[in-house]
Each structure stands twice: as C-alpha cells, then as structure tokens.
Amino acid sequence: MSYVKEAFDKVKLRDPDQPEFHQAVWEVLETLEPVFQKHQKYQDARILERLTEPERVISFRVPWVDDKGVVQVNRGMRVEFNSAIGPYKGGLRFHPSVNLGIIKFLGFEQILKNALTTRPIGGGKGGSDFDPKGKSDFGSNEILSVFHE
C-alpha cells in the first residue's frame, strides 16, 4: 500500500463521520503521491499525518439573545491546522449545515491557499451552525463577538 493511501485510510478511520473533510484531503493527497514516491524523507517525517491532523480543535457554545428576547444557543468551532510558517489565518462560516467536518475541510484547504500567497501565515477556519439570514444586526453581532474573544 502506498504511503498516501495509508495516510488517507488513517484520516477516514480517525474521522469516519466527516465526508467533506475526506474528499478535500483525498483530492490533495492524490496529487501529491508522485512527490512522496520520489522523496522518502517526507514519508519518514510523516508529513501527511502532520498535515491532515489539526494542531488544535476548539468547540464551544454560543449563547445569544434573539429579537424577541429569547436566549438561543448555537455551536461554534475553530480548527487551527498548521502554524509552521506563521500564525493561523482563515475566515468564518455561518450556516445551519456547519459541522466539524466542514470546518476541517475549509481549514485544510486554507493551509494550501495561505501557503500560495507566500506570506508567513498558517491555516485555520472557524464557524457556527448559526444562520444569519433574517437575523437582526444585534443577534449577528452577538455571535461575531464570541469569535473575536
């Protein structure tokens, strides 16, 4: 079995409920296979395992008050993938479908996008299952303030 396939199988085994993350990882790893076949030192350093496992995953509750004065609670998360070339950088995604697999997929791709800029920044992403559509600025700002802390 190739190193790339072995590393991908570990990702699927470790995170079986994250198909979006699996797809993003496979698309990247598949294109890198010739590099890993040619350079054993990258395999020895376990580069793919280090690339596909976040340095940190933070999950937290996000309480906020809606326009009717009712407290609502959403889930927030932040995935910080790689700070090898600099501090984490990545945006926020707010949508009812957001889950850890989606945030990991977006954070994983952010590593590569940031590396291409040649700026010294790593990759990360944050988000919440909060749906900003139809919400007042007050409710949306409450959610955003949690991510700025």
Predicted features along the sequence, with ranges:
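N-terminal ligand-binding/catalytic initiation module
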Residues: 1-149
